[in-house]
Amino acid sequence: PISSQPKSRNRLTTSTTDATGTYHFPLLKDTDYRLKVEKEGFFKQSARISTKGRPSAIIVTDFRLFPLVVDQVVRLENIFYDYNKWDIRPDAAIELDKLVLTLEDNPTVSIELSSHTDCRGKDAYNMNLSEKRAKSAVDYLISKGITKERLKSKGYGESKPSETCVCEKCSDDEHQRNRRTEFKVLSK
């Protein structure tokens, strides 16, 4: 089921998606909403939407449901890092904010955030860099209110590339895709 709730009211509207996953809700003008999606065996998901300042009340919101399975690795889209850096980029913050919502909607879940580097550089340096990246992601989630007891960070260096190119022949895009963060469910 999927539900919508206006931010300023306690009224909850629930709907079931059709066979294609489509859903519809009547929306009030100039109102903030929180949509919540639940499916057995999957992470609960939510999104915030608003009709404020919109000439049309038709709002399209897609949800990507992840299976809630212990030890399952989920790649976070667009959590990439600049070369030799571990700071959270603005594009990565947007994706980590989605993970914050997911963790808020699933308060019993604990995860490991794992970070990876590309193949350039020495193994020990890359391991240290990936550990800093994973810790940066965890620190970001903690700064948004997720308790540190639910989070673990782990760096894998260049040991688990997502791209199978030979290092010297990898394109810049392939190197970028290897510099990533994923999460694994530790408990549900």
Predicted segments, located by residue:
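Periplasmic peptidoglycan-binding/anchoring modules of Gram-negative envelope and division proteins
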Residues: 81-115, 138-143, 183-188
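A short, solvent-exposed beta-strand micro-motif common in secreted/extracellular proteins
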Residues: 21, 29-41
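Periplasmic OmpA-like peptidoglycan-binding domain that tethers envelope proteins to the cell wall
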Residues: 114-188
